[in-house]
Amino acid sequence: MFGLGGQELLLILLIILLLFGAKKLPELAKGLGKGMKEFKKAQTEIEDEFNKAMSDPPEKKEKESPSDKG
């Protein structure tokens, strides 16, 4: 995971605990979870739009003839 071992992750968690305190950790985790959910939702929407655009046939544009310009 990001090239981090168990000791590094434990150290990072300890620093976060010291900075924010035990009472703030659930709030931080909840906010992080919501952010990840929003990110995945946006990613899915973009993928769906891309797949739809790739599966739809291209629209043919009619060229204007010189007689149409008037």
UniProtKB/Swiss-Prot annotation:
Gene Ontology annotations of biological process type: protein transport by the Tat complex
Membrane topology recorded in Swiss-Prot or TrEMBL: Single-pass membrane protein
Gene Ontology CC terms, in alphabetical order: TAT protein transport complex
Keywords linked to the UniProt accession: Cell inner membrane, Cell membrane, Membrane, Protein transport, Translocation, Transmembrane, Transmembrane helix, Transport
Location of the region described as Disordered in the Swiss-Prot/TrEMBL record: 47-70
UniProt biased composition (Basic and acidic residues): 57-70
TM region positions: 1-21
Domain of life assignment: Bacteria
Gene3D superfamilies linked: 1.20.5.3310
Any GO MF annotation of the entry: protein transmembrane transporter activity
InterPro entries, sorted: TatA/B/E, TatA/E
Compartments reported by the entry: Cell inner membrane
Function: Part of the twin-arginine translocation (Tat) system that transports large folded proteins containing a characteristic twin-arginine motif in their signal peptide across membranes. TatA could form the protein-conducting channel of the Tat system.
Family: Belongs to the TatA/E family.
Subunit structure: Forms a complex with TatC.
HAMAP family in the record: TatA_E
Name of the featured protein: Sec-independent protein translocase protein TatA
Phylogenetic classification of the source organism: Bacteria, Pseudomonadati, Chlorobiota, Chlorobiia, Chlorobiales
